[in-house]
A protein has these predicted regions:
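Well-ordered beta-sheet/strand-loop patches within structured domains
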Residues: 2-11, 15-50, 61, 65-396
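Noncatalytic, helix-rich "gating/capping" subdomain that lines the substrate-entry/channel surface
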Residues: 53-54
Length: 396
């Protein structure tokens, strides 16, 4: 069973669901529950003819407490949170300052989720849209010039989880998030992630970390910044802003699950852009806590609502079994280095429905992820001669 809320997708394994349901025999007389006469209780599969008005049924009993407990752990635990509060002001230097975090609260209605699950299972459906109550944060904008330009309330939130990241990747994500904190997006302007990000290198505080470079995964300055661009993208995409430019990664990366919600960048060539067509300017607050990253967009909400549906996935391909090898003079002769993991391929599509007043528009986001083999580089002598196989250290 799959549970969805916005871009979040949760799965409950079949073996867990099996324990939720038991079956029992029930008897009724003209629609009322009865205890059947002893003569009608028989061993085996054959039941004697029933008197008029008496019916025998097999009914399902659902263990709602067990279901609620499972959904609490799998769904509510990662989603539920309390609403925050923030005071937005300007410092003496004119810089925008945030005191607090205007993150909205969420509560999964577990009782309603259990009932929806029962209906879905009894009807043979495999997906439940979670009933989630949202709680608005308290936002105080002290600076009058910001209020005059429409900075009044929370408009959109982008979030992602980078659990399992390396130390350098976590560092780069933190540095990248700070570049956008306090960034102001005028009304009717086009926001460019790459332009706002600026230079990426050791002088701007970044470390080398794995980055997708063509058909390889190699260390480069700023590895992990796609976590920041993906977080920024999810917020405006889910809020219904027009997306001008967005590209998925060439292969599926688990940090950006569910697939089809990522936005890769590689300055200066690959960017993420959107148009602020809202009721006023937008102001960004960025934040990270633990392994979660957030983009909060403050502004003035208009009458638009947005709904995202997906992902629809197909063309699932296993990773190639053969190992890809490339010979290079960048490594010492005989040195062996892994530059690509085995990755399965797939295609994914999301639909977005944006409603304004009496009208609505539907757009789709398509992503194609390559299936990739295990990939090694092997060092060769500068003459270009390839070393014999027995001269290569397989443990390197």
């Amino acid at each position: 069973m799959t549970y969805r809320h916005r871009h979040f997708v949760f799965s409950v394994p079949a073996k867990t669901i099996t324990g939720w349901k038991t079956e029992r025999e029930a008897w009724t007389y003209r629609g009322l529950d009865i205890d059947p006469p002893a003569a009608l209780r028989v061993d085996g599969d054959t039941v004697p003819p029933l008197p008029p008005g008496i019916e025998r049924h097999v009914v399902a009993d659902w263990n709602r407490n067990l279901m609620r407990s499972a959904l609490q752990e799998i769904v509510a635990l990662p989603l539920d949170r309390t609403a925050g509060s923030v005071v937005i002001s300007r410092s003496q230097t004119g810089a925008i300052a945030f005191d607090g975090l205007g993150l909205p609260g969420r509560t999964v209605d577990l009782d309603a989720a259990v009932e929806l699950t029962i209906v879905a299972l009894e009807q043979g459906a495999d997906t439940v849209v979670l009933p989630v109550r949202e709680h608005l944060p308290k936002i105080v904008v002290e600076d009058r010039s910001l209020r005059d330009q429409g900075i009044r309330e929370l408009v959109a939130v982008g979030e992602s989880d980078y659990t399992g990241s390396t130390k350098n990747r976590i560092h780069n994500i933190g540095v990248g998030l700070k570049k956008f904190n306090g960034h102001f997006i005028p009304q009717h302007s086009t926001f460019s992630f790459v332009e706002t990000l600026g230079s990426v290198g050791p002088k701007t505080g970044y470390r080398k970390e794995l980055t997708i470079l063509g058909d390889k995964t190699m260390p480069d300055y700023g590895g992990g910044l796609c976590q920041v661009s993906t977080t920024a993208y999810r917020g405006v995409w889910e809020a219904g802003f027009p997306i001008v430019q967005r590209k998925n990664h060439s292969f599926a990366v688990h940090y950006y699950s569910p697939q089809g919600t990522d936005a890769t960048i590689y300055p200066p060539h690959i960017d993420m852009k959107f148009v602020n067509d809202g009721s006023g300017a937008l102001l960004i607050q960025t934040y990270n806590e633990g392994t979660k990253a957030y983009f909060l967009y403050y502004g003035t909400r208009d009458n638009r609502t947005a709904e995202i549906i997906g992902p629809y996935t197909w063309d699932h391909r296993a990773a190639p079994t053969e190992t890809k090898t490339e010979y290079t003079t960048d490594l010492a002769p005989g040195e062996r280095k892994k530059v690509g993991e085995k990755v399965p391929g797939m295609k994914a599509q999301w639909l977005r429905i944006v409603r304004r007043g009496d009208g609505e528009s539907i757009d789709s986001v398509f992503s194609a992820y390559e299936a990739r083999p295990l990939f090694y580089q092997i060092g060769v002598a500068g003459t270009g001669a390839v070393l014999p196989a027995d001269a290569v250290d397989p443990a390197a």
